[in-house]
Design a protein with these regions (language model features):
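Acidic, low-complexity terminal tails and accessory targeting/binding regions
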Residues: 2, 72, 86-97, 138, ...
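Loop-to-helix element that buttresses phosphate recognition and phosphoryl-transfer chemistry
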Residues: 5-66, 115-130
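Short active-site segment of divalent metal-dependent hydrolases/proteases
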Residues: 12, 153-154
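Phosphate-coordination/substrate-recognition cap region in phosphate-metabolizing enzymes
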Residues: 38-104, 221
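Surface-exposed helix-capping loop/turn segments at secondary-structure junctions
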Residues: 45-49, 138-145
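Active-site signature of alpha/beta-hydrolase-fold catalytic machinery across serine-
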Residues: 65, 156-160
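Short glycine/proline- and acidic residue-enriched helix-loop micro-motifs
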Residues: 103-124, 221
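Short basic (Lys/Arg) and small-residue
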Residues: 150
Length: 222
């Protein structure tokens, strides 16, 4: 069976500001680099045979800080890029809620079928993510592989693994920056072994991970 370690990138300034960050090529903050460094220490003894990464800077920086310790080069895959937030890209969530609350609430209630204005739906994103997972399982039927990506990508991957509706990913799955999730492939399908493990972040102090705000009353972070 193959073991796949799904990593959400370290924190960025936009994450800390609760700003919609999809395809913008935002780097890690200093706190995010430290998160990636302590995560690398945790993972360095795992016999990884490959590291895959989104080409976006925040994910690639995270992947490189880990792969430097194990002597591997990240393999870039466009299917791992974050959801396209369209017209909301770069905007503060508070501003979107103030200026277009009806559109945001409709999307938030069913982010699989609906897309941000000019952006990508959860179903469209999940199709490329499932394609990546299928190719990954075929390429690495045994062994250990690291995958560094983004919040929505990882949550939609977990929805697929669990057979859960992608419409539920924002409502039911909380995923912090630099969190570790582990899935494994079996002949009969996928298993979730670990989800949103941030125990390694205790080394960088409280508040290192991005907060996840409550659903509905105060909208979830992007």
């Amino acid at each position: 069976m193959g073991h796949f370690y799904l990593i959400r990138h370290g924190v960025t300034e936009w994450n800390a500001e609760n700003r919609m960050c999809g395809r913008s090529d935002i780097p890690l903050s200093e706190a995010g680099r430290r998160q990636a460094e302590v995560l690398a220490e945790r993972l360095k003894l795992i016999p990884l045979e490959a590291v895959y990464s989104s080409p976006l800077k925040r994910a690639l920086q995270t992947a490189r800080l880990i792969s430097e310790l194990i002597g591997l080069q990240p393999i870039l895959d466009e299917r791992l890029v974050e959801l396209d937030y369209g017209e909301w890209e770069g905007k503060l969530l508070a501003d979107i809620l103030r200026n277009d609350p009806a559109t945001y609430r409709a999307w938030d209630a069913d982010p699989a079928q609906l897309a941000p204005p000019g952006g990508e739906s959860g179903l469209a994103a999940q199709q490329r993510i499932v394609s990546f997972l299928d190719s990954l399982a075929g390429r690495h039927p045994q062994g250990h592989v690291l995958v560094v990506s983004h919040k929505t990508v990882c949550r939609l991957a977990i929805c697929h693994v669990l057979g859960m509706s992608p419409s539920e990913y924002r409502r039911r799955l909380i995923l912090s920056n630099a969190a570790l999730s582990i899935i494994q492939s079996q002949p009969w399908g996928w298993q979730l072994m670990t989800f949103n493990d941030t125990s390694h972040l205790s080394e960088v102090g409280p508040g290192a991970g991005e907060p996840e705000l409550g659903f509905r009353e105060s909208a979830p972070s992007p």
